[in-house]
Curated annotation (Swiss-Prot):
Pfam families hit by this protein: Ponericin
Lineage of origin: Eukaryota, Metazoa, Ecdysozoa, Arthropoda, Hexapoda
Listed GO biological process terms: defense response to bacterium; defense response to fungus; killing of cells of another organism
Keyword tags: Antibiotic, Antimicrobial, Fungicide, Secreted, Toxin
Keyword Secreted recorded: yes
Tissue specificity: Expressed by the venom gland.
Localization (cell): Secreted
Protein name: U1-poneritoxin-Ni3a
Keyword Secreted included in the entry's annotation: yes
Cellular component, GO annotation: extracellular region
Length: 30
């Protein structure tokens, strides 16, 4: 279900991309 997908996404972000998260947030706020 979508919860499983969301959890996988969270784990991926923890491993791959604090910087990517920051960049996405910066882009979203512009």
């Amino acid at each position: 279900g979508w919860r499983d997908w969301l959890n996988k996404g969270k784990e991926w972000l923890k491993k791959k991309g604090p910087g990517m998260v920051k960049a996405a947030l910066a882009a979203a706020t512009q």
